[in-house]
Amino acid sequence: MVKIRQFLLAILWLQLSCVSAAKNEVEQSPQNLTAQEGEFITINCSYSVGISALHWLQQHPGGGIVSLFMLSSGKKKHGRLIATINIQEKHSSLHITASHPRDSAVYICAVR
């Protein structure tokens, strides 16, 4: 009986998470971006409801989705990529320094 109860609680939690996520409006800008090699690029993401984490994802043409960053506060850096989040302002940015043709991809901001 205990195992069944834990399973049901997990299902309920997943359902509540989906409902909460459905009410959160996420806006990413710019929606399209063209840059010259070597430029500094910024992609912004705003959301309407408090979150536990924000993910920056990348998908190259014909490829799978890759997680770049998971943020709950502050700033993270990996190579030429920098991601920041401001929980109070409900805003995150992804910065690409010294852009390169291999950076051509779809960038996705996802919240939970």
From Swiss-Prot:
Keywords from the named record: Adaptive immunity, Cell membrane, Disulfide bond, Glycoprotein, Immunity, Immunoglobulin domain, Membrane, Receptor, Signal, T cell receptor
A GO biological process held by the record: adaptive immune response
Ig-like domain boundaries: 24-112
Record's function text: V region of the variable domain of T cell receptor (TR) alpha chain that participates in the antigen recognition. Alpha-beta T cell receptors are antigen specific receptors which are essential to the immune response and are present on the cell surface of T lymphocytes. Recognize peptide-major histocompatibility (MH) (pMH) complexes that are displayed by antigen presenting cells (APC), a prerequisite for efficient T cell adaptive immunity against pathogens.
Protein name: T cell receptor alpha variable 41
Subunit structure: Alpha-beta TR is a heterodimer composed of an alpha and beta chain; disulfide-linked. The alpha-beta TR is associated with the transmembrane signaling CD3 coreceptor proteins to form the TR-CD3 (TcR or TCR). The assembly of alpha-beta TR heterodimers with CD3 occurs in the endoplasmic reticulum where a single alpha-beta TR heterodimer associates with one CD3D-CD3E heterodimer, one CD3G-CD3E heterodimer and one CD247 homodimer forming a stable octameric structure. CD3D-CD3E and CD3G-CD3E heterodimers preferentially associate with TR alpha and TR beta chains, respectively.
Record-annotated disulphide pairs: C45-C109
Residues bearing glycans: N32, N44
SMART domains: IGv
Gene3D superfamilies hit by this protein: Immunoglobulins
Keyword Glycoprotein: yes
PANTHER family: T CELL RECEPTOR ALPHA VARIABLE 39, T CELL RECEPTOR ALPHA VARIABLE 41
Signal peptide as annotated in the record: 1-21
GO cellular component, one term: T cell receptor complex
Subcellular location: Cell membrane
